[in-house]
Amino acid sequence: MTLSIITINRNNAVGLEKTLASVAAQTFKEFEYIVIDGASIDESAEVIKAHETEFAHLKWVSEPDMGIYNAMNKGLKMASGNYIQILNSGDCLVADDVIERMTQALQEKGYPNILYGNMVKCFPDGRRLVDKGFAGQEITMLGMYTGTLNHDSAYIRRDLFKKYGYYDETLRIVSDWKWYLQVIIFGGEQPQYVDMDVTLFDMEGFSETNKDLAKVERKKVLEQMLPSAVLADYDQFASPMDQFKRLQRHPLAYRIVWFMERCLFKMEKAQNKKNKTAQWN
């Protein structure tokens, strides 16, 4: 098993320094590290040069690109590892032995096409939230309609990009989600999960503008990939299903709502019976 880690960066020298330091500190050293810098005008290139000797297999370029996913695709085409991890500038590996433990997990699980762990979201106010994604549950279209697989905490077989294609560079926010949609939902590739914190994800740059654009792009992708009648059902029922799943995680609240629903059902049943009796009379 060989691994290629890809970091993309543009004008984020401070974040890049954190990312490079976390990767350089790994106890497992035999991986390929690829840094794609988008012709930054800050100190990013100097940061990379300062860390060059810390990596056994480092490739890096600093040149103009056409956006995040264009940069990712550049890195993918340069990669030679069996597995890929994309770790964006500003994000870090949670501990010095993460790669070592993830490679062990790959072996234990029979080298699946995709293995993912947990992503720890780091907020500007100091809060941290562990995002386990689907946490090993079967990933369905309903789950992908509102959720996604966090790509920075996933190890992906490089061959999957040859089979399903690279990231859609016409999208600015959700191309990784679209790729997972194609691979998991339409391609039938079910990822494996390990309950391990893998990455620290910097939430500081995630704005409401990004959220709004992500919604617009998701809708565009779904309209392209799903029949309109099917999409209409997901539009109508996805939110109630999320609410139902949330209730299931809280047994007392679930029992209260279940009891109320049963009461409403019996009331409606009695009313329907009364209406039918009135019709016969």
Q: Where are each of the predicted segments found?
A:
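Peripheral/terminal regions associated with large enzymatic or DNA-binding modules
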Residues: D97-A105, L226-V230, N281
